[in-house]
UniProtKB/Swiss-Prot annotation:
Its main location: membrane. Residues 1-20 are cytoplasmic. Required for induction of competence. The gene is comB. PANTHER family: MEMBRANE FUSION SUBUNIT OF EMRAB-TOLC MULTIDRUG EFFLUX PUMP, TRANSPORT PROTEIN COMB. GO terms for cellular component: plasma membrane. Residues 42-449 are extracellular. It is a single-pass membrane protein. Keywords: Cell membrane, Competence, Membrane, Transmembrane, Transmembrane helix, Transport. Belongs to the membrane fusion protein (MFP) (TC 8.A.1) family. This is Transport protein ComB.
Length: 449
């Protein structure tokens, strides 16, 4: 190698392979690159706080319905219940006995009304419609009614028989008197004929009743005026006596001919008897209807009191217990026992609730993106992305300062809903914006938010 080339190589090494070219220049280039990157590249700015999974809505507040002791308690945190499931049962008081008493009384009154309606139908139709002997005596009442109606019929029949007998006797007496009248009239005619024969001197038939008197007159001498006067006087005396008897007979005849009317009020008597019984039945039915209403009202009241002796689920859902009453065996009426949340699987969404210090709340707004990460199981974490849906207008005061309540509603997949539980705690990251790295570190250095 030529000596001049060696000199050039040594010069080159001395010129370009010194400390400045080996360290300072690369460092300067790296610094320029980092400064350029820090100026151009951006960092997401976020806030982090604790958050819990809450329901998107509350289905029902489960309150204590009695001051009595709790005998059965099926309330459990995050327990899935169906509509109608028994949750709490209290010790029964006097309302249980009262309810049974009203129920028994109501059954008896309804049975009594049914039997009374059988009596009403039997009275209306005159036939026994009772399927069996009743314990209220209504069938016996119907039998008494039938007996009374029978007595009325028998009495009327007997009365009519007596009247018929009396009428027959009156008719017979009248006929006999009529015969006497006819006979007396015939006798009077005979004596009148005899009188005429004596006075005129005519002959008299032998079958005439006064023929013997006429013969006696004839035998004494017709020419003797005194005899004729005596004979006429005797005949007139007989006629006068017969006419007196005839007048008496006619009076008797007129009195004996009266006929008594037969008893004709049986139908009205029977109808009156039926009406009396039906009116009484109607009154009893009205009273029974009132008693039934009172018993039903009492039973309903006692039933409501009994219903207060147990608490059931109003619909399907998940239980969240009130920690203040969950371990108590006696809870005041009206106190909150638990809340019923919708099932996450069926609802398909949940609400994330967090509290943020008042010094950071100005950096977030409704609509900002958030990410929730579960922390209870590091090996099986869940990540939920959502946006802020509400920020409380006023802060909640605590010992650690003032905090604002933040809520974010998120939709869940079926897999997420199956793994998630109400009340699970996690970390909630809120994306508040972006800064260049240069600006970020500058703010950190200057202690700016």
């Amino acid at each position: 190698m030529k000596p001049e080339f060696l000199e050039s190589a040594e010069f080159y090494n001395r010129r370009y392979h010194n400390f400045s070219s080996s360290v300072i220049v690369p460092m300067a280039l790296l610094l320029v690159f980092l400064l350029g990157f820090a100026t151009v590249a951006e960092k997401e700015m976020s806030l982090s706080t604790r958050a819990t999974v809450e329901p998107s809505r509350i289905l029902a507040n489960i309150q204590s319905t009695s001051n009595n002791r709790i005998l059965v308690n099926h309330l459990e945190e995050n327990k899935l219940v169906k509509k109608g499931d028994l949750l709490v049962q209290y010790q029964e008081g006097a309302e249980g006995v009262q309810a049974e008493s009203y129920a028994s009384q109501l059954d008896m009154l309804k049975d009594q009304k049914k039997q009374l309606e059988y009596l009403q139908k039997s009275l209306q139709e005159g036939e026994n419609h009772f399927p069996e002997e009743d314990k209220f005596g209504y069938q016996a009442t119907f039998r008494d009614y039938i007996s009374q109606a029978g007595s009325l019929r028998a009495s009327t029949s007997q009365q009519n028989e007596t009247i018929a007998s009396q009428n027959a006797a009156a008719s017979q007496t009248q006929a006999e008197i009529g015969n006497l009248i006819s006979q007396t009239e015939a006798k009077i005619r005979d004596y009148q004929t005899a009188k005429s024969a004596i006075e005129t001197g005519a002959s008299l038939a032998g079958q005439n009743l006064a023929y013997s008197l006429y013969q006696s007159y004839k035998s004494q001498g017709e020419e003797n005026p005194q005899t004729k006067v005596q004979a006429v006087a005797q005949v007139e005396a007989q006629i006068s006596q017969l006419e007196s008897s005839l007048a008496t007979y006619r009076v008797q005849y007129a009195g004996s001919g009266t006929q008594q009317a037969y008893a004709s009020g049986l139908s009205s008597q029977l109808e009156s008897l039926k009406s009396q019984h039906l009116a009484k039945v109607g009154q009893e039915l009205t009273l029974l209807a009132q008693k039934i209403l009172e018993a039903e009202s009492g039973k309903k009241v006692q039933g409501n009191l009994l219903d207060k002796g147990k608490v059931t689920a109003s619909e399907d859902g998940v239980l969240h217990l009130n920690p203040e009453t969950s371990d108590s065996s006696m809870v005041a009426e009206g106190a909150l026992l638990a809340q019923l949340y919708p099932s996450l699987e069926r609802e398909g969404k949940a609400k994330l609730t967090a509290y943020l210090s008042s010094k950071y709340v100005a950096r977030i707004k409704v609509g900002d993106s958030v990410r929730y990460t579960t922390t209870h199981d590091a090996g099986n974490q869940l990540f939920l992305d959502s946006t802020i849906t509400s920020i409380d207008a006023t802060a909640t005061k605590t010992e650690k300062g003032n905090f604002f309540k933040i809520e974010a509603e998120t939709n869940l997949t079926s897999e997420q809903a199956e793994k998630l539980r109400y009340g699970v705690e996690g970390r909630l990251q809120m994306i508040t914006g972006k800064k260049s790295y240069l600006r970020y570190y500058l703010d950190q250095f200057l202690n700016k938010e």
